[in-house]
Every structure is written in C-alpha cells, then in structure tokens.
Amino acid sequence: PETLTPYGIKTLILNESCVHLDKNRPRASLDLLYSEVERLGKIFRKEAKAKKLIKNWKSRVSEIKSKLVNYSGKRVFLYDSGEDKPFTAGKFAMPTAMIEALGAENITSNMDTSWGRTSWEAVAAADPEFLILLDYQSGGGAADLMAFLKSHPAMKYTSAVKNEAYVAIRYEELTPGPANIEAMAKMAEAMKEVF
C-alpha cells in the first residue's frame, strides 16, 4: 500500500492474503471471511447482496455442522507441497479456520504465519489422523502426494497414511472465498468415512 499511495491509488488489504502486514490480528476464522465480504460489499455498494450471501453461507455451515460426527481433537494435516520440507497452513490461513469449524485440529496451527514450511519430523510426531491433500489439478495431484507420503520414512507410519484417510481439495477451495463452504462439506464427508 505504501508504494501505491503516493500515486493516489487506494488499496484494500485482504486479511488472510496479507497477514505479513499485520501479525497482531486474530487467528483465521470464518468470521474473517464474512467480514471480508462485508468490506467488499461496502466498497462496491452492494451491502444487501453481501449480507444475503453471508447469511446463506452461515446457514450452509450450520447445516454441515449439524451432520458432523464428533471430530473433536481429531488431528488433521494439510499437505500443500514440498518433499524436503512440507508447505502447509498455519494459524492465519483459511484452511485452519475450516478445519477448526469442523471441530478438528490443524496440527500446524501453531505456525505464526498463514502459509509456511515445517519439518516432516514435527508432522510425523503429531501423528495426523486425517490429511487434506492440495490438488492443483496438474500432474498426478493428490494421488502423487499420497504416494510420496506412503514412501516417506517417517510419514508412512502415521495413522492417516496407514489408513489412507484423506481428501483432495483444490487450491481455490482453500483460499478465502465462496468455495470454502463447499470444501468444508467435502472435508466433513470424507472425515465421516474415517471416523
């Protein structure tokens, strides 16, 4: 924003995407998604449509939650990419909010970032029970990620890998936006088959 202001260009800082600009903000939550849409509604003078959209999302989230089995304390790991060190979602990333809204726990939610790298040792030590595999819809997608995890010397012994407990979620379903809600439904349905 500082580089554009001198040119008279107004900017909007998106909460999840620009976390590096405000490390004092709260953890990711669905409320942050809703507030972003409210902000956009105000900017484009579409407040009524924004409120209706948010109301519909909240209703759908309530519907998803009403069908949940007890996922309390279930350990989930989101694997985006990386073989030397896994790239994953931290406490400011929307997937953490989605996982927590389902009552489960993102094992990397202690990472003080939205997205970042951790170690395989830390992931294996947390023994995830369920995996969210990011599917960029290129190459082998989630199948390739799972094949890698099955061959990894530490990860192959984790509960999620041994039980092939995972769901493939597309990138756009995990970045803040309308697709988050149905991605939560996909996650809940896949978790129901495991737990």
Where are the regions a protein language model picked out?
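Proline-aspartate-enriched helix->loop->beta-strand connector
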Residues: P1, I9, W120-Y136
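Basic- and aromatic-lined ligand-binding clefts that recognize polyanionic substrates
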Residues: A48-L102
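Short helix-initiation/N-cap motifs at beta->coil->alpha
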Residues: M111-W120
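Extracytoplasmic ligand-binding site segments that recognize negatively charged/polar headgroups
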Residues: I9-R39, G73-M94, A142
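Structural recognition of the beta-strand scaffold that forms the well-ordered cores
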Residues: T11-N15, R75-D80, N106-S109, F130-L134, ...
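Extracytoplasmic/secreted envelope proteins and their assembly/folding machinery
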Residues: P1-T5, Y34-G41, K51-I54, K58-V61, ...
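Structured C-terminal subdomain patch of bacterial secreted/periplasmic proteins
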Residues: R27-R45, F130-F195
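Short, structured coil segments at secondary-structure junctions
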Residues: P6-I9, L102, V161-K162
